[in-house]
Each structure stands twice: as structure tokens, then as C-alpha cells.
From Swiss-Prot:
One of its GO terms (cellular component) is extracellular region. It comes from the Eukaryota. Residues 1-28 form the signal peptide. Substrate binds at K35, R38, K69, P70, V71, N72, T73, K94, R113. Its EC number is 4.6.1.18. The keyword Oxidoreductase does not apply. GO terms for molecular function: lyase activity; nucleic acid binding; ribonuclease A activity. GO terms for biological process: defense response to Gram-positive bacterium. It catalyses: an [RNA] containing cytidine + H2O = an [RNA]-3'-cytidine-3'-phosphate + a 5'-hydroxy-ribonucleotide-3'-[RNA]; an [RNA] containing uridine + H2O = an [RNA]-3'-uridine-3'-phosphate + a 5'-hydroxy-ribonucleotide-3'-[RNA]. Endonuclease that catalyzes the cleavage of RNA on the 3' side of pyrimidine nucleotides. Acts on single-stranded and double-stranded RNA. SUPFAM superfamilies: RNase A-like. This is Ribonuclease pancreatic. The active site is at H40, H147.
Length: 156
């Protein structure tokens, strides 16, 4: 009797484990919109004048795990203002896609560039504060930024 119950429950247990195995990885996967926020948004701070800002932020935001990300830009504006860019001037992305948008106004940003002598795991970055219009790629529903494409001088 107990053996019969075990034989019935075993396939159900195996099925449950298989389903969890397929579902679980997608539960922990970071969406493109969340990755954009992690890698590029720092609205709580003004563009820091500290020369160590990029070194600290690149580590804190997990962009130096396994390699040194060569270039990254942090945006020091409210998230809603950056999300609004998705409904501003449509421009062609660097890769030729047509889902990029340029901000109507300049934004406070910090550019982080890997120094020439820097090697993993000792990633060292040069910090540059700028006021630039930014270009982001947008997708999804809701339509939100998923990629930082460029920053450009204000031409007005």
C-alpha cells in the first residue's frame, strides 16, 4: 500500500521539480528595463565631483564582475523624466535600429571611462560630469528605456 502511494507520488514530485526548474530561472532574470535602471540611473545624487564616484558606482552596480565594463553613463535625473524621453524626438540608434529617442533638454550625467592602464580585477575609471542631451532605446509595454545609446551636446 505504501509502495503504491510512493509510485503515484514520485512522478508528481518529478513533474513539480521539472516545472520549478523551468520557471525559477525566469523569476530571477533581470528585465532589460531593470538592467537599464541598475546600470544608468542615479537620480538620488547630483553628478558627483568625487574622482572615485565611477570606481565606487561601477562596483556597486555590478559592472566589474568578471571583467571591466569599458564605458558607462549615469543619469542624475528623476526616473520619470528619463522614461518620458521615449515619447520625445525619435532618432536612429547607433546600431541602425529606429527605437531610439533624444531628450528635449540637457540632463546631468556622469561618464565613466576605463583608464588605459586598468586591468580586471582592478578596474579604475575616469569620472567626467556633463550636461548633455541623452539618447535611449525604448521598448516594451509600458514603453520604457532599455538601453543607453549616447549623449550629445545641446545644439540649441
Amino acid at each position: 500500500m505504501a509502495l503504491e502511494k510512493s509510485l503515484v507520488l514520485l512522478p508528481l514530485l518529478v513533474l513539480a521539480l521539472l516545472v520549478l526548474g523551468w520557471i525559477q530561472p525566469s523569476l530571477g532574470k533581470e528585465s532589460r528595463a531593470m538592467k537599464f535602471q541598475r546600470q544608468h540611473m542615479d537620480p538620488g545624487s547630483s553628478s558627483s565631483s568625487s574622482s572615485t564616484y565611477c570606481n565606487q558606482m561601477m562596483r556597486r552596480r555590478n559592472m566589474t564582475n568578471g571583467w571591466c565594463k569599458p564605458v558607462n553613463t549615469f543619469v542624475h535625473e528623476p526616473l520619470v523624466d528619463v522614461q518620458a524621453i521615449c515619447f520625445q524626438e525619435n532618432v536612429t540608434c547607433k546600431n541602425g535600429q529606429t527605437n531610439c529617442y533624444k531628450s528635449n533638454s540637457t540632463m546631468h550625467i556622469t561618464d565613466c571611462r576605463l583608464t588605459g592602464s586598468s586591468k580586471y580585477p582592478n578596474c579604475a575609471y575616469r569620472t567626467s560630469q556633463k550636461e548633455r542631451r541623452i539618447i535611449v532605446a525604448c521598448e516594451g509595454s509600458p514603453y520604457v528605456p532599455v538601453h543607453f545609446d549616447a549623449s550629445v551636446e545641446d545644439s540649441t
